[in-house]
From Swiss-Prot:
UniProt source species: Neisseria meningitidis serogroup C / serotype 2a (strain ATCC 700532 / DSM 15464 / FAM18)
GO cellular-component term (any): cytosol
Catalytic activity: (7R,8S)-7,8-diammoniononanoate + CO2 + ATP = (4R,5S)-dethiobiotin + ADP + phosphate + 3 H(+)
Protein name: ATP-dependent dethiobiotin synthetase BioD
Key words, A-Z: ATP-binding, Biotin biosynthesis, Cytoplasm, Ligase, Magnesium, Metal-binding, Nucleotide-binding
Family affiliation: Belongs to the dethiobiotin synthetase family.
GO biological process: biotin biosynthetic process
EC number: 6.3.3.3
N-terminal signal peptide: none
Length: 215
């Protein structure tokens, strides 16, 4: 791996933050120079909570890039989608600020993992969806899914969107932490999605996040 990767999910609260932190930790253990970024954090006042979770999982303190807000360029107080949180805070989301911060991180680190807010179709602004931004920046996507009920549908919809927009899927991360309590559903979801990934995105990697990785 090298460059900037966008971590998205099939839904809200699917485990993107833990997945991002665990992947960054694994890369650190491999001797890679890696940093995570949360370009838009909502529901916070000062520090991006997701970045704090990343650092805890990675086993490192807050970095200089964190102190300079390069890893958390836009923070809004209301816990909502970025476009609504920005409106309620009475200011516009600054896409140029986000792009510049990511570029600066990419110049300093071998790998940058950018954790998005929610799923691919979450609005960043009134006119721009998250998937539009990913396409504009030509970022490969790391998609987080799970074995809970509904995940097959949401994952296949995400696959279809990535294909429609011509975006490369780097990997699908199956998050066991958010599995269904029904073991049959969880296991079938895993086997089905593993087969669909091979059929739809043959070059993409399959990864799994174990329950023991929960923070």
């Amino acid at each position: 791996m090298k460059g900037v990767y966008f971590v998205s999910g099939i839904d809200t609260d699917i485990g993107k933050t833990v997945a991002t932190g665990m992947l960054a930790k694994q890369l650190l253990q491999q001797g890679k120079s890696v940093i995570t970024q949360k370009p838009v954090q909502t529901g916070c006042q000062d520090i991006a909570e997701d970045i704090a979770v990343h650092r805890k999982i990675m086993g490192i303190p807050m970095q200089e890039a964190d102190k300079r807000r390069l890893t958390m360029p836009e923070i809004f107080s209301y816990p909502a989608s970025p476009h609504l949180a920005a409106r309620l805070d009475g200011r516009a989301l600054d896409l140029d600020k986000i792009r510049t911060a990511t570029q600066e991180l990419a110049a300093q680190y071998e790998i940058v993992l950018v954790e998005g807010a929610g799923g691919l179709m979450v609005p960043l602004t009134e006119k721009l969806l998250t998937i539009d931004y990913i396409q504009q920046q030509a970022y490969p996507v790391i998609l987080v899914t799970s074995g809970r009920l509904g995940s097959i549908n949401h994952t296949l919809l995400s696959f279809a969107a990535l294909k429609q927009y011509g975006i490369r899927l780097h990997s699908l991360v199956f998050n066991h932490i958010h599995d269904s309590r029904d073991a049959h559903i969880a296991q079938y979801s895993l086997s089905y999605l593993k087969c669909r990934l091979k059929a739809d995105f043959s070059e993409a990697e399959w990864m799994e996040l174990a329950k023991t990785d929960a923070v």
